[in-house]
């Protein structure tokens, strides 16, 4: 199973491609899509869409794991993040991938056992699971790897350990169902 984990952002979007072979995790690829805040949000969204599309074409993941939106003090930042996430959801559906979403606290809990873990702890555990000695920077990349690992670990355990439920499909199926039933609205 190959999972593409994405830590979305309107200026920096981290990604991590992880392969799970039985109980062994391997790093396939990871990186950061760097954008300029001087670019229009529409241009940034197109770049993110195109670059993630190229990553999907190259590595052929079966699933995309995405960090859920969080409430930000700045409404404009939250709206931009929502637009980026919407483009990633549309890309995922257009490519026929499963979409799973995880809250930051859930990723931290699954990887470290503590929902309030810091970025250093998540980075350490992501490197531990992937057997990587050297640091991976920036944290957007290790967060994306953590999201992919969280998805694979939850899948191996039959669902999120905090919720005790089955797999965490996109927004309880909301976006996935909408995109499937309204393909003509997807660009």
Curated annotation (Swiss-Prot):
Cross-referenced HAMAP family: RuvC (MF_00034)
Record's subcellular location: Cytoplasm
Name the UniProt record assigns to this protein: Crossover junction endodeoxyribonuclease RuvC
GO BP: DNA recombination; DNA repair
Species, as recorded: Prosthecochloris aestuarii (strain DSM 271 / SK 413)
Main enzyme class: hydrolase
Job of this protein: The RuvA-RuvB-RuvC complex processes Holliday junction (HJ) DNA during genetic recombination and DNA repair. Endonuclease that resolves HJ intermediates. Cleaves cruciform DNA by making single-stranded nicks across the HJ at symmetrical positions within the homologous arms, yielding a 5'-phosphate and a 3'-hydroxyl group; requires a central core of homology in the junction. The consensus cleavage sequence is 5'-(A/T)TT(C/G)-3'. Cleavage occurs on the 3'-side of the TT dinucleotide at the point of strand exchange.
GO molecular function annotation: crossover junction DNA endonuclease activity; DNA binding; magnesium ion binding
Cofactor(s) of this protein: Mg(2+)
Signal peptide span: none
Keywords of the record: Cytoplasm, DNA damage, DNA recombination, DNA repair, DNA-binding, Endonuclease, Hydrolase, Magnesium, Metal-binding, Nuclease
Similarity annotation: Belongs to the RuvC family.
Residues where Mg(2+) 1 binds: 7, 140
Co-factor binding details: Binds 2 Mg(2+) ion per subunit.
Quaternary data: Homodimer which binds Holliday junction (HJ) DNA. The HJ becomes 2-fold symmetrical on binding to RuvC with unstacked arms; it has a different conformation from HJ DNA in complex with RuvA. In the full resolvosome a probable DNA-RuvA(4)-RuvB(12)-RuvC(2) complex forms which resolves the HJ.
Catalysed reactions, as listed in the record: Endonucleolytic cleavage at a junction such as a reciprocal single-stranded crossover between two homologous DNA duplexes (Holliday junction)
């Amino acid at each position: 199973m190959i999972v593409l984990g994405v830590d979305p952002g309107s200026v920096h979007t981290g990604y991590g491609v992880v392969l799970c072979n039985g109980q062994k995790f391997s790093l396939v690829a990871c990186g950061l899509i760097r954008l300029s805040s001087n670019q229009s949000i529409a241009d940034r969204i197109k770049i993110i869409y195109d670059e993630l599309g190229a990553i999907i074409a190259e590595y052929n993941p079966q699933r995309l794991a995405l960090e859920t939106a969080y409430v930000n003090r700045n409404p404009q930042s939250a709206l931009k993040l929502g637009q980026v996430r919407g483009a990633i959801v549309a890309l995922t559906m257009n490519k026929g991938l499963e979409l799973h979403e995880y809250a930051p606290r859930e990723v931290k809990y699954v990887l470290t056992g503590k929902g309030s873990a810091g970025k250093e702890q998540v980075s350490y555990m992501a490197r531990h699971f992937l057997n990587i000695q050297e640091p991976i920077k920036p944290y957007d990349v290790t967060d994306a790897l953590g999201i992919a690992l969280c998805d694979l670990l939850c899948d191996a355990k039959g669902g999120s350990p905090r919720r005790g439920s089955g797999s965490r499909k996109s927004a309880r199926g909301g976006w996935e169902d909408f995109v499937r039933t309204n393909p003509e609205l997807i660009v």
